[in-house]
């Protein structure tokens, strides 16, 4: 059963206070890919995130939204999934604790919420236009069948040269993600550009110029190790970000004062040594008289 609440959710004081798993190396790569797209006006399109949790990566991604574009986030937010994904229930806004947390977190950094589709990611292809997205972050279910469906939707929604990021690509507890992504490389013409310790980045467009520019940028980064291997007939850039220095984080719209710590009680006054010794002597003396 989903957990609902009407109580206000306190906003985070800063980006580091938003719960989630979005490591510095991937923040750097999101920043690099999205800023690169700004250099090519013809690479217009919307932003899409499948799976949001409490919004850490969505907050980051939303900062690259350009005028006239739309940012869509699709997540169940702990609401029950109906048997019929096309039912009217899919458009209901369940006030779950997770969704309220996402909204409070996102609005702490942005004036407006993204378009929220509170539904299984299997519906997203029916909600957006084909070839409409320039950047897609797939971070929803870890089950192979679901990830495979998310990849199919991403391929349909991705515009020319769109970048697609896949989370938990190398996590030992998520073999279905790796299987689905490599399956897409083998059978769906997905071209991987690079991988980090957690994510894979690819495109259905021309990967070669992106890969070449990324390699030049990586040469300038002393905090990122990288190597290139031939995998499935194409170069794949491996990136180690253990020492990565994250880019400047998104800044809250309105500074939030950290919660005040409750005042500590004053320590009790110490008992004078002489008085305590006298009390002990009287107690012992009374015992002897008995």
Predicted segments, located by residue:
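S-adenosylmethionine/decaboxylated-SAM
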Residues: 2-20, 34-289
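A short, well-structured juxtamembrane/interface segment
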Residues: 25-36
């Amino acid at each position: 059963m989903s957990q609902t609440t009407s109580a206000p959710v306190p906003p985070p004081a800063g980006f580091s206070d938003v719960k989630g798993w979005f490591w510095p190396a991937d923040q750097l790569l999101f920043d690099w890919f999205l800023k690169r797209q700004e250099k090519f006006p013809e690479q217009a399109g919307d932003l899409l995130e499948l799976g949001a949790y409490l919004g850490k990566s969505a907050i980051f991604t939303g900062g690259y939204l350009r005028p006239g574009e739309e940012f869509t986030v699709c997540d169940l937010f702990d609401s029950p999934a109906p048997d019929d994904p096309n039912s009217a229930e899919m458009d209901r806004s369940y006030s779950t604790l997770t969704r309220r947390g996402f909204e409070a977190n996102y609005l702490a950094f942005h004036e407006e919420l993204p378009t929220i589709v509170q539904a299984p990611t299997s519906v997203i292809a029916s909600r957006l236009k084909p070839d409409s997205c320039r950047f897609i972050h797939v971070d929803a279910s870890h089950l192979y069948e679901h990830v495979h469906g998310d990849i199919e939707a991403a391929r349909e929604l991705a515009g020319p040269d769109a970048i697609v990021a896949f989370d938990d690509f190398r996590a030992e507890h998520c073999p279905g993600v790796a299987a689905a992504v490599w399956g897409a490389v083998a059978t769906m013409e997905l071209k991987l550009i690079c991988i980090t310790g957690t994510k894979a980045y690819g495109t259905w467009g021309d990967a070669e110029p992106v890969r070449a520019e990324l390699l030049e940028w990586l040469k300038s980064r002393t905090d990122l190790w990288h190597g290139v291997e031939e995998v499935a007939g194409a170069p794949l850039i491996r990136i180690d970000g253990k020492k990565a220095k994250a880019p400047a984080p998104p800044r809250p719209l309105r500074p939030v004062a950290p919660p005040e710590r409750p005042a500590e009680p004053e320590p009790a006054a110490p008992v004078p040594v002489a008085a305590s010794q006298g009390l002990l002597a009287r107690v012992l003396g009374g015992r002897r008289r008995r």
